[in-house]
Amino acid sequence: MNIIELFGPLQEIIFFILEIGVILGSLGVVLLSNIVYSAFFLGLVFFCISLLYFALNADFVAAAQILIYVGAVNVLIVFAVMLINKPESLKIFPVWTVGDKITLAICLTSFFLLVNIILNTSWSNITVITESKGFLESNFTQNVQRIGSLLLTQYLLPFELLSIVLLVALIGAIVIARRENLIETNKKKVLQIKKSPTTF
């Protein structure tokens, strides 16, 4: 049984709330200058997308979304950005530059084009195929087994390489953060030496 069917007439409201969560979370990711806040909003986006997968009866994809993106990737991002976050970046909203305005114009144009496409699509011509519960359960089991088999046989090397790339990215962020902290510490020491009175 589809999870969203349990709520009956509230399904449109639930979809609307999840879509608003995705949109607001995405805006928080790109508009906030504090990287830690952006990472938390990114986690909100991942979580709302996983709930959308649950609503569409894609249980395995939703569970993978929560475990991989929310539980692993977003946690790593939060730890990494906490290491490289500078203490002087206390402003919530950044100062707008010419590049930011151009990027905003491009994003708004793309957004309105997508909205126009969605509104002009004849959704009434799309037919919904109803499937039995037994078929869904067997199909779900076969899909999970097939995905696991492909990841451990045919796509084993790309899967391991992707894990190594994520590990290298995290280590690189830590190295850059330590280097920036060392540079800032040396600058502060030099300024303190210059400001302190010379005693003989």
UniProtKB/Swiss-Prot annotation:
Keywords: Chloroplast, Membrane, NAD, NADP, Plastid, Plastoquinone, Quinone, Thylakoid, Translocase, Transmembrane, Transmembrane helix, Transport. GO terms for cellular component: chloroplast thylakoid membrane. InterPro entries: NAD(P)H-Q_Oxidoreduct_6 (IPR050290), NADH_UbQ/plastoQ_OxRdtase_su6 (IPR001457), Nuo/plastoQ_OxRdtase_6_NuoJ (IPR042106). Gene3D superfamilies: NADH-ubiquinone/plastoquinone oxidoreductase chain 6, subunit NuoJ. GO terms for molecular function: NADH dehydrogenase (ubiquinone) activity; quinone binding. Its EC number is 7.1.1.-. It is found in: Plastid, Chloroplast thylakoid membrane. It is a multi-pass membrane protein. The chain crosses the membrane at residues 13-33, 35-55, 64-84, 102-122, 156-176. It is an enzyme of class 7 (translocase). It catalyses: a plastoquinone + NADH + (n+1) H(+)(in) = a plastoquinol + NAD(+) + n H(+)(out); a plastoquinone + NADPH + (n+1) H(+)(in) = a plastoquinol + NADP(+) + n H(+)(out). Its main location: plastid. NDH is composed of at least 16 different subunits, 5 of which are encoded in the nucleus. NDH shuttles electrons from NAD(P)H:plastoquinone, via FMN and iron-sulfur (Fe-S) centers, to quinones in the photosynthetic chain and possibly in a chloroplast respiratory chain. The immediate electron acceptor for the enzyme in this species is believed to be plastoquinone. Couples the redox reaction to proton translocation, and thus conserves the redox energy in a proton gradient. Belongs to the complex I subunit 6 family. This is NAD(P)H-quinone oxidoreductase subunit 6, chloroplastic. The gene is ndhG.
